[in-house]
Regions:
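Flexible, glycine-rich loop/tail regions that form catalytic "lids" or insertion modules at the edges
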Residues: 1-115
Length: 115
């Protein structure tokens, strides 16, 4: 995609959009049950070393390493408790009006009360 041999897909377009925001000084915060990989495994925002010795090591977030002057990019894999997480993220967004705060609903065949 970067070389121009393939069309830009949704995941790449989303990554470019987030990169442009954090490079412009606008923090981005995404939360949801599968936010790191994306609900359809399209995002790859958090990369994991499959050979790590501890569960709390071996994760890398490329969008946190664009430049020394960029804004923060935070991805949170939350618990499956939509109402509580959405309420928290709404409050967070209200107190941080200059930050892009996204709550990503989990996709599935179940009723999601927060939606």
């Amino acid at each position: 995609m970067a070389a121009g041999t393939q069309a830009i897909d949704w995941g790449m377009a989303e990554t470019l959009a987030y990169a442009s925001l954090v490079e412009s000084g606008h923090p981005v915060r995404i939360s949801g049950e599968d936010s790191g990989r994306g609900t359809f495994a399209h995002r790859h925002a958090v990369l994991h070393d499959q050979n790590r010795e501890r569960w709390d090591q071996g994760s890398y977030v490329p969008l946190r390493h664009l430049s020394d002057t960029q804004a923060d990019f935070l991805v949170i894999d939350s618990i499956l408790n939509e109402e509580a997480v959405l309420a928290y993220e709404y409050g967070y967004a209200c107190s941080s009006p200059n930050e892009l705060v996204i709550w990503e609903a989990q996709f599935g065949d179940f009723a999601n009360g927060a939606q």
